[in-house]
């Protein structure tokens, strides 16, 4: 009954207005009040500040500064095996598996469409037909910077407008087409082994999605899909190394990765509800890709 009420509130709440309000509040410099809120948040969600570059809550002038805190150097060693794809974020595995008939598994009884997820680009979706996907949920306690799972050259960024449902396990199990209806930023990278998609999905009170090359992508929001194309070579090419930061959430959300057919094989530890740490092994390149 309580779960039904929570889901009902998701549909009734003015989520965009609430998110804008929370984003503004999280950017306020309120001195001791900000510090008190940060301390409460740390205690409430059991945030491990020993890993932070600056573990002192009073050092953060706004809640957003705290939320996108950097980690100490060496806190997340990057697996340097060229045949290993590394985790892009501290998170929890929501779902993973094959892309079947252009659809990705969301939760029991729910699937969502790869083409819709990618902003309705059929040609782009074709690149991932019969491929593999993983959905990673970043909880409030997690480190909220997102990194590259392998070396890649940015080909395209797509902003897709949408709703702002919460993306926690309860809503994933109860809101149809959740990840393809929420606002999101799709990043397509070309790698030595094929293209990959890294999709940053917005949610209720996610005040901002940013990338290292474009800064804040949202807000502002808009009614239209927007696309940016990037050169593959030359001084304007955006080339990011494995483990390098590529984006961040100001208040957390979800990362979805898409891989082409036969490119990767997820490591054995990759299972739903399994915690992940950025830089640790995520998937192995398929044996045919290694040759």
Swiss-Prot record:
- Cofactor(s) needed: pyruvate
Instruction: Supply one GO CC term from the record.
Output: plasma membrane
Q: How does it sit in the membrane?
A: Peripheral membrane protein
Provide the protein's localization: Cell membrane
UniProt modification remark? Is synthesized initially as an inactive proenzyme. Formation of the active enzyme involves a self-maturation process in which the active site pyruvoyl group is generated from an internal serine residue via an autocatalytic post-translational modification. Two non-identical subunits are generated from the proenzyme in this reaction, and the pyruvate is formed at the N-terminus of the alpha chain, which is derived from the carboxyl end of the proenzyme.
Q: Where is this site: Cleavage (non-hydrolytic)?
A: 252-253
Q: Which GO terms describe its molecular function?
A: phosphatidylserine decarboxylase activity
Kindly indicate whether the keyword Cell membrane belongs to this entry: yes
Give the EC number(s) under which this enzyme is classified: 4.1.1.65
GO BP annotations listed = phosphatidylethanolamine biosynthetic process
The record's subunit annotation is: Heterodimer of a large membrane-associated beta subunit and a small pyruvoyl-containing alpha subunit.
Question: Main role?
Answer: Catalyzes the formation of phosphatidylethanolamine (PtdEtn) from phosphatidylserine (PtdSer).
> What is the official name of this protein in its record?
Phosphatidylserine decarboxylase proenzyme
| Origin species | Photobacterium profundum (strain SS9)
């Amino acid at each position: 009954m309580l779960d039904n009420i929570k889901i009902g509130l998701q549909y009734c709440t003015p989520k965009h207005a609430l998110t804008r309000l929370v984003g503004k509040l999280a950017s306020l410099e309120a001195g001791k009040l900000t510090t008190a809120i940060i301390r409460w948040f740390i205690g409430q969600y059991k945030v491990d500040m020993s890993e932070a570059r600056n573990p002192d809550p009073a050092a953060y002038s706004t809640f957003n500064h705290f939320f996108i805190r950097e980690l100490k150097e060496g806190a997340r060693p990057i697996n340097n095996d060229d045949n290993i794809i590394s985790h892009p974020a501290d998170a929890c595995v929501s779902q993973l598996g094959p892309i079947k008939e252009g659809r990705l598994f969301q939760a029991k009884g729910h699937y969502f469409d790869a083409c819709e997820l990618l902003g309705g680009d059929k040609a782009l979706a074709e690149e991932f037909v019969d491929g593999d996907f993983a959905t990673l949920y970043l909880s409030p306690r997690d480190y909220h910077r997102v990194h590259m799972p392998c070396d890649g050259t940015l080909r395209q960024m797509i902003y897709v407008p949408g709703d702002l449902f919460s993306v926690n396990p309860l809503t994933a199990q109860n809101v149809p087409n959740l990840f393809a209806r929420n606002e999101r930023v799709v990043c397509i990278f070309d790698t030595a082994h094929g293209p990959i998609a890294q999709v940053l999905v917005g949610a209720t009170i996610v005040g901002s999605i940013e990338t290292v090359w474009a800064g804040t992508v949202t807000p502002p929001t808009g009614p239209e899909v927007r696309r940016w194309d990037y050169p593959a070579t030359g001084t304007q090419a955006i080339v990011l190394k494995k483990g390098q930061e590529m984006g961040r959430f100001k208040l957390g959300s979800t990362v979805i990765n898409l891989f082409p057919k036969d490119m990767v094989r997820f490591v054995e530890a990759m299972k739903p509800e399994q915690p992940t740490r950025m830089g640790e092994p995520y998937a192995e390149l398929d044996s045919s890709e290694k040759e």
